[in-house]
A protein has these predicted regions:
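Major-groove recognition helix of helix-turn-helix-like DNA-binding domains
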Residues: 72-92
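Glycine-rich loop/turn
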Residues: 64-71, 75, 178-179
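A short, well-structured juxtamembrane/interface segment
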Residues: 106-113, 175-176
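Short helix C-cap/helix-to-loop transition motifs enriched in small/turn-promoting residues
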Residues: 69, 95-96, 107
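Short active-site-adjacent helix-start/loop capping segments
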Residues: 52-55, 67-72, 87, 133-134
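Single, function-defining residue in the core of a domain
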Residues: 1-58, 62, 92, 99-103, ...
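Catalytic micro-motifs at enzyme active sites that drive phosphoryl/nucleotidyl and oxygen chemistry
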Residues: 73, 112-113, 141-143, 201
Length: 387
């Protein structure tokens, strides 16, 4: 069935086009469109991501070189002008692509669900990455007086090892403000760094029946209500505490748990706050250690997909490009899982980047390609994921 299909077309066949079209209709994305549809736009942007195009002009040159293959790649019959793609990114509702990104994240999370920790319930890490922008080119993204930037806030499923939710803001907004956009699930665990010490939001997590683990700031004001006397190795404190600061006490009126842990590998001490009384102190520390997976995700995203350089200057264009990067990431994760590939996903992407216009079956491509010299640079795409 895939004998005469290009590799890129085989890859994008894993996506649910019907679902994407539902979002297009919802936001009237193809209104007044004659040739270059929203689906064509998505595939064109994904082709640019997977083939490592540096700019919009670079992407258009690539399509000009493959003019005869355009229709079968899924980007339409008509030649794509730079102004056509730029206008689509500028004017078409970014929510079409963001909603589809959420759909792809949900599908990837459900398919790749595993249990890397012996703790019942979903486990998420929430963090952000800042992408610097030129203020004169992106005036809407003002960060500091002479600097611009955007933040991508990501809720990362640490067991499926794909994002479960994300939101985009200007870099000037404090990290903790993004916590209000999360729909917390009962009995799930949410891991935060100390930038997310909003006691109002932490109390909302508690009232939802969810659990949090957050690293405490050094200026935390509290009183000890009860503490454990016998503790395992490297656990310095395991106590029930209550906030004493006037404002913080009003935001979080109940007691919670404070755990101080000494990490021998890093030779440093960590203090965690949590409402998960059912966990041991060592499980709390182990849960927080998994937060590094979201940092690896950000590093991988910036290194292998195009979000450091944007192909449009409007907020809408930036949001579309970030959404397409997330969609591409999830697609590769789904293909990697569905095909039970034994290669690292870095190898998969390297093979794809030079094979998108070949007519080799995906299975043959990944089984037969000699890629023994390719090493993962610093980390796998899905570190520790077992297939």
């Amino acid at each position: 069935m895939n004998q005469d299909k290009y590799v890129f077309a085989q890859l994008t066949a894993f996506m649910n086009r019907t679902q994407f079209n539902n979002y297009v209709r919802k936001y009237d994305g193809n209104r007044y469109v004659k040739h270059f549809t929203c689906w064509n736009q998505l595939l064109a942007m994904m082709f640019g991501q997977l083939s490592n195009r540096e700019s919009l002009r670079d992407l258009i040159v690539a399509f000009e070189a493959h003019r005869a293959k355009q229709y079968h790649l899924g980007v339409g019959r008509e030649p794509i002008a730079k102004t056509t793609l730029a206008s689509a990114n500028q004017n078409r509702d970014c929510r079409i692509f963001e909603d589809f990104a959420f759909y792809m994240m949900k599908e990837a999370c459900e398919k790749r669900a595993t249990n890397i920790l012996d703790i019942p319930g979903k486990k998420y890490a929430f963090d952000s990455t800042t992408i610097s922008l030129c203020l004169s080119t992106f005036p809407w993204a003002k960060f500091r007086r002479k600097k611009g930037g955007v933040k991508a806030h990501v809720l990362y499923d640490i067991e499926a090892q794909v994002p479960a939710f994300y939101t985009v803001s200007t870099a000037s907004k404090h990290d903790s403000t993004a916590m209000s956009s999360i729909l917390y699930e009962p009995n799930a665990y949410y891991i935060f760094d100390r930038a997310y010490d909003s006691f109002k939001e932490l109390y909302r997590i508690h009232l939802t029946g969810s659990f949090y683990v957050v690293r405490a700031k050094t200026n935390l004001k509290y009183k000890t209500v009860k503490w454990k006397r016998r503790m395992p190795k490297n656990v310095l404190t395991d106590a029930e505490v209550k906030l004493t600061g006037y404002r913080s006490e009003k935001k979080y009126p109940e007691s919670f748990r404070l755990v101080r842990f000494y990490d021998e590998e890093e030779e440093r001490e960590f203090t965690f706050l949590t409402n998960a009384k059912q966990l041991t102190a060592l499980e709390v520390a182990e849960l927080y250690k998994k937060r590094w997976l979201v940092e690896l995700f950000f590093k991988w995203l910036k290194q292998h997909l195009k979000i450091k350089k944007f192909w449009g200057t409007s907020e809408n264009a930036v949001r579309i490009q970030i959404a397409v990067a997330i969609i591409t990431y999830c697609l590769v994760a789904i293909v990697h899982y569905d095909m039970k590939l034994k290669r690292s996903t870095y190898e998969v992407l390297q093979i794809l980047s030079i094979s998108l216009t070949d007519k080799t079956h995906l299975r043959d491509l990944f089984d037969k390609t000699k890629f023994n010299d390719v090493k993962e640079l610093d980390y796998p795409l899905f570190p520790g994921f077992k297939y």
